[in-house]
Each structure stands twice: as C-alpha cells, then as structure tokens.
C-alpha cells in the first residue's frame, strides 16, 4: 500500500503544480464546446476521489466480500490510457466550479482523507472490500485506490492537452 500511496502523491503533485502554474484566464476556459476546462477536470477528480473514499468506507462497514480471481487480472493501468473517451457518470460530472485555490484545497483534502483511510484500514482489509466501478464492475479496495492513481494520470495528460490547445489558440 505504501508504494500505491507514494504513486498517488507523485501524480497528484504533478497535476497540482501544472494547475497552479496555469494562467488564470485559461483555467476555466474550454478548448472546445464539448471538452472540459482544466477547472472541470480538477473538480471531476475531486468528486471521484470523494466517491471512492465513501464507497470504501461503506464497504468496510458491510460484510467482507472478495472480488473474483479474473477481476484481479484486469490491470488498473488501463484507466490511464486515453485511446477511448468515456462519459463521466452524472454524480462525478463537474458543476458550480469554485475558484482555482478552492478546488485545489478541496482536492488536497479529499486526497488526505483517502490516504488516512488507507493507512488506518491497511491493504489486507482493503482487499476484502468490494466497490462498484461504473465501467469495470466490482473491484476490490486495493484496486480502487490503484485505479485513482491511473485515473489521475489520465486526467493529468488531458490537462496538458487542454493547455496545448488553449495556448495554441491564444497565439493566433
């Protein structure tokens, strides 16, 4: 679990730094009508992290359930690959975007809660928790935490793409 939490910290720091270094007039600007702004991406990440932490906590309160062997073979790294665009479920679709500092503070808080939960729970107990992923179905708690790392990596790449598009548009 320590290595998973360390990877979470690494990608979180990269993403947070990229967002903090973003020109404020680009932060909430969409590169195209049907594409998210950087603000929307960060809000989405915060919402996802909060939902996963809530699901893990509920799973801990419930009866222990192990995820099937075949499900454990699905690599969570697949989440970071951006060859396919997914529609975010409504509950994690960003709305009412706060300013940059507030979104980043909320995101840091959500990460701190997740990490605290993981440390208190431990990886052996997390393996007995089953949570429902909207696209992959039931995954265990360790896979859910690992998935967050790759989900954040996916959106870090998206933020870089958004910045490239917006900066190219601003030059013209």
Specify the residue positions occupied by each region the protein language model found.
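Absolute protein N-terminus
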Residues: 1-4
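Hydrophobic packing residues in well-ordered alpha-helices of helical domains and bundles
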Residues: 8, 38, 103-107, 145-148
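Long, hydrophobic N-terminal alpha-helical segment
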Residues: 8-15, 19-45
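Short, contiguous alpha-helical
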Residues: 30-77, 126-172
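Structural signal for well-ordered, non-membrane alpha-helices
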Residues: 12-20, 49-53, 57, 111-122, ...
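Short hydrophobic/aromatic segments of transmembrane alpha-helices and their interfaces
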Residues: 9-10, 24, 108, 127, ...
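Acidic/histidine-rich alpha-helical segments that form the ligand environment
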Residues: 7, 75-126
């Amino acid at each position: 679990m320590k290595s998973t939490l360390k990877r979470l910290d690494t990608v979180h720091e990269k993403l947070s730094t990229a967002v903090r270094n973003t020109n404020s007039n680009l932060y909430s600007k969409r590169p195209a009508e049907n594409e998210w702004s950087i603000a929307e991406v960060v809000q989405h990440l915060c919402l996802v992290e909060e939902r996963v932490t809530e699901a893990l906590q509920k799973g801990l309160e419930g009866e222990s359930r192990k995820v099937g062997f075949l499900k454990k073979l699905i690599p969570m790294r697949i989440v970071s690959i951006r060859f396919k665009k997914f529609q975010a479920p409504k509950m994690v679709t960003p709305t009412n975007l706060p300013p940059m500092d507030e979104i980043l503070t909320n995101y840091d808080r959500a990460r701190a809660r997740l990490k605290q939960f993981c440390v208190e729970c431990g990886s052996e107990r997390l393996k007995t928790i089953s949570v429902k992923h909207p696209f992959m179905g039931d995954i265990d708690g360790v896979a859910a935490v690992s998935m967050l790392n790759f989900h954040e990596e996916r959106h870090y790449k998206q933020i870089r793409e958004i910045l490239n598009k917006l900066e190219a548009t601003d030059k013209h």
